[in-house]
Amino acid sequence: MSFKKLPDNIERLLPEAEIYLQTHPAVVFAYLFGSLAKGKPTPLSDVDIAIFVNGVVDFAETKLEILGRLMDILQTDEIDLVLLNTTNLPLIHNVMKNHRLIADKKPFERHIFESLAMRKYFDFSIKESTMLKRRYFHG
């Protein structure tokens, strides 16, 4: 698998991807995160997008459909598409730290998701810290 640099005009292509996500029937909200969201892409950057979907029976099929269309729109296969419905708490926390909202059909539902995700993450991080301390001190 070889890495391909993002198109030089990636910033000009993003609005069309945003429109696609805003109009996709399953997408409730979406974030751009990572180096592009920070406005600091590097030569090794990819496009990091996180989506939350509703009314989906097959998450994998929906992800592949959306990913395929985003590849066409953004003219690259260097896209990391994350389904927030099924991903882990540390990755959700990473998305929440550095993101740009690019689709938001149901702001109240998004707010509830963000609040619950952050509370769960902080509860998890406290438990994780305790477990690591025990492991470190007890070998």
Task: Identify what each model region corresponds to.
Residues 1-29, 37-39, 43, 54-139:
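Catalytic core of pol beta-like nucleotidyltransferases
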Residues 47-51:
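Short, aliphatic-rich beta-strand segments
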